[in-house]
């Protein structure tokens, strides 16, 4: 998938700069005082930002488009475009593009239940 230049999340700290094309960004998970960025090709990049700081960067840089990225609990930010399967009972969330990436993540029943309800509401509002 081709990404336009403006559709990039810039993460800059000290002498380090990371450019992540948004269409390739599947999820970001907390890892102690760091965050791990996971892209469609399975590449994981550890950055010296806490998840809350990454969340703030997303909101600052993307504005209204930041709604595609959802914070799930304390340890996860997902790109909602990749939501493929939610199983509340098994506490499982699958993020996939239906082709080259497949990630199974765990989340609480409460978080997944809210996510499922939100997606259903979004879907129903789009039909109207």
Task: Give the location of each predicted region.
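Basic, polyanion-interacting recognition surfaces, primarily
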Residues: 2-128
